[in-house]
Amino acid sequence: DISDDGDDTDGNTTDDSTDIDIDPVPLIEVTKTASVTDDGNGITGTGDVINYVITIENKGNVTLSSLTVTDSLTDANGVSLVMGNGPYFSGANQGSGLGTLLPGEIATYRAYFIITDAAALTGAISNIATATASSPGQTNNVSDTSDDGDDTDGNTTNCLLYTSPSPRDKRL
């Protein structure tokens, strides 16, 4: 006897395979963190660089393709800001190239923004990243919006950085 699935009503009572179905689970998690490179004056504000690190982890059991990352950057008044650079692909911990994520793999993207006087005057900069990918046989069916890596702090969708107006700003 090689194997038997225990179902004698299927017509084969001696050698039939035991099948276990594994359902595909496409799932990603996007995390974004931010740090500020100060321009030397010791105050977060105009001229400082906000460095963003975006990680996308494939938490599912299938390889994902066509991975794209979009970024929305706004000031505290909701005015759209233009990212200085990025998000751009920095690498993946299992060696996949741009746009592909193996199960369990983490891809890293980076971006930065140089704080302008106008953005600093609003007091905050908000940044949200969204990743979208395709699972086998599907198109753009997997997505997630960034959190800051700590879902317990109530800040589950963006990174806020409070800024100070530039001392060079004569409008104060």
Give the role of each language-model region.
Residues 31-40:
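Short, solvent-exposed loop/edge segments of extracellular or virion-exposed proteins
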Residues 47-62:
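Short beta-strand elements of extracellular/lumenal beta-sandwich folds
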Residues 1-23, 141-161:
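Terminal edge beta-strands and adjacent linker/stalk segments
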Residues 8-9, 13, 39-40, 73-115, ...:
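Extracellular beta-sheet repeat scaffolds used for adhesion and glycan interaction
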Residues 162-169:
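Conserved small/polar residues in nucleotide/adenosyl-binding loops
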Residues 62-70:
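Short, hydrophobic/aromatic beta-strand segments
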Residues 117-126:
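Short glycine/proline/serine/threonine-rich loop/turn segments at secondary-structure transition edges
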